[in-house]
């Protein structure tokens, strides 16, 4: 019985071996034992054609009752694969590398672009164009919408070297009107007396900055100024902004400590009354080493809509200066400073003498992460009115996780 099985197996192997000569996808079956494995391995490693191998214990194939004592033999099934080293033409056919190509001899610099590379390139352009159309559509909807807008990075770089304005970077989209570049981060309503952050460019600046963009319609990082609605004449207001800039060393007329840090996404509004040219110091608790930073996100005339997903993904370090109000970005309090007092409004209201916050979360003490520290931001209003100053304690690389937002509603008389 075993002899008959072996003969049938040998005959099948011969048939498969003969078909492999003409078929590039054929299989081969071989019995491998201690006396033959070295020769088979040598032939495999010396060969140039790629193979796919499967090994099955031969004693199980030969006799499932394991009556055969030869337990060291295995059945090796190999499959020839297509030679991927040969190039592929545009019709997805393999080009024989042995054929002579006279065109390559005439032009050594010519390269054959396969169908796969061209498809990927076309899909990349389509994807970029689709994303660009979605951005333009979203911006047009926001321009025509008078509802509240999400808070995001309101800072921008100065187009000239005038340091009277705040500087930063942001990505902007070039629309049909080359004299007006607007982004969802900078759009404000024209009817609700909010600050309007529209970046203005002339044709020459845009043409020079578009330069070497790879995908049509994309504009590199642009530099722009911040303008408020009241600044109809930006050139005239530049001198006023210089005089309105807040000195970081200016003494505090009033000291406020904002609410406690909570381990979840939350938002809190603190109402404060002040007077013109009165310096209000905001003390902010911070925990070192956890990636969270206190950031000044904006100044508004109406309460903005808070959306952490639109927060800047890069750390903002700029302060805010305008003819109406000046606000410094939070910075660490010097060790010898006397601004860390206990006469804070929130300290009295929230009971800061306890070791836990009103939400039963531990306060940032020395035993937490890398220790606690105190930051300070100074606010100086130059004109009466109501202002909403937005601070946020969040991770720039993960703005939607445990973001603490504090909005100072400042009523200036």
From Swiss-Prot:
SUPFAM superfamilies (alphabetical): ICP-like (SSF141066)
Gene Ontology molecular function: any one: cysteine-type endopeptidase inhibitor activity
Keyword Secreted carried by entry: yes
PTM field: Proteolytically cleaved.
Domain of life of the source: Eukaryota
Pfam families for the chain: Inhibitor_I71 (PF12628)
A single BP term in Gene Ontology: symbiont entry into host
Start-end of Polar residues biased regions: 325-339, 346-360
Extent of the signal sequence: 1-21
Consequence of changing residue 397 to A: No effect on the inhibition of FP3 protease activity
Region (Disordered): 325-367
GO cellular component, one term: cytosol
Keyword Manganese: no
Keyword terms, alphabetized: Cytoplasmic vesicle, Host cytoplasm, Protease inhibitor, Secreted, Signal, Thiol protease inhibitor
InterPro entries from the UniProt entry: Chagasin-like_sf, Prot_Inh_falstatin
Motif (BC loop): 284-294
Annotated compartments: Secreted; Cytoplasmic vesicle, Secretory vesicle, Microneme; Cytoplasmic vesicle, Secretory vesicle; Parasitophorous vacuole lumen
Entry's free-text remark on domains: The C-terminal domain is sufficient for cysteine protease inhibition.
Recorded family membership: Belongs to the protease inhibitor I71 family.
Subunit and partners: Oligomer; probably composed of 10 monomers.
Functional description taken from the UniProt entry: Cysteine protease inhibitor. Inhibits cysteine protease falcipains FP2 and FP3. Required for the invasion of host erythrocytes by merozoites. In the mosquito vector, essential for the gliding motility of hemocoel sporozoites and, therefore, for salivary gland invasion and the subsequent transmission from the mosquito to the mammalian host. Required for the invasion of host hepatocytes. During the liver stage, may prevent host hepatocyte cell death likely by inhibiting host cysteine proteases.
Name this protein carries in UniProt: Falstatin
Natural source organism: Plasmodium falciparum (isolate 3D7)
Record lineage: Eukaryota, Sar, Alveolata, Apicomplexa, Aconoidasida
């Amino acid at each position: 019985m075993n002899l008959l099985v072996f003969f049938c197996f040998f005959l099948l192997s011969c048939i498969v071996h003969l078909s492999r000569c003409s078929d590039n996808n054929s299989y081969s079956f071989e019995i491998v034992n201690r006396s033959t494995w070295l020769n088979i391995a040598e032939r495999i490693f010396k060969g140039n054609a790629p193979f796919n191998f499967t090994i099955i214990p031969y004693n199980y194939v030969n006799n499932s009752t394991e009556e055969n004592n030869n337990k060291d033999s295995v059945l090796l099934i190999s499959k020839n694969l297509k030679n991927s080293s040969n190039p592929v033409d545009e019709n997805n056919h393999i080009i024989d590398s042995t054929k002579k190509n006279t065109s390559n001899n005439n032009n050594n610099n010519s390269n054959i672009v396969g169908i796969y590379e061209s498809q990927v390139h076309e899909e990349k352009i389509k994807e970029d164009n689709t994303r660009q159309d979605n951005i333009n559509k979203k911006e047009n909807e926001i321009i025509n919408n008078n509802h509240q807008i999400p808070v995001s990075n309101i800072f921008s770089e100065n187009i000239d070297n005038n340091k009277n304005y705040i500087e930063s970077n942001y990505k902007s989209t070039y629309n049909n009107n080359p004299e007006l570049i607007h982004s969802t981060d900078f759009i404000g309503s024209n009817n609700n007396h909010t600050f309007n952050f529209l970046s203005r460019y002339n044709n020459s600046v845009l043409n020079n900055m578009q330069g070497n963009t790879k995908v049509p319609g994309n504009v590199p990082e642009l530099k722009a100024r911040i303008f408020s609605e009241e600044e109809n004449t930006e050139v005239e207001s530049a001198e006023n902004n210089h005089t309105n800039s807040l000195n970081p060393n200016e003494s505090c007329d009033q000291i406020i400590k904002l609410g406690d840090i909570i381990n979840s996404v939350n938002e809190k509004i603190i109402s404060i009354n002040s007077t013109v040219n009165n310096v209000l110091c905001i003390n902010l608790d911070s925990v070192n080493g956890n990636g969270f930073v206190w950031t000044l996100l904006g100044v508004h005339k109406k309460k903005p809509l808070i959306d952490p997903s639109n927060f800047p993904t890069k750390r903002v370090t700029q302060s805010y200066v305008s003819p109406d109000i000046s606000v410094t970005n939070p910075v660490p309090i010097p060790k010898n400073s006397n601004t860390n007092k206990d006469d804070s409004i929130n300290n009295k209201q929230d009971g800061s003498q306890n070791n836990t916050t009103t939400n039963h979360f531990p306060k940032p003490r020395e035993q937490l992460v890398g220790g606690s520290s105190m930051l300070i931001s100074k606010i100086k209003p130059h004109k009466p009115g109501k202002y909403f100053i937005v601070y946020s304690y969040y991770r720039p690389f993960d703005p939607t996780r445990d973001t603490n937002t504090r909005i100072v509603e400042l009523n200036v008389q």
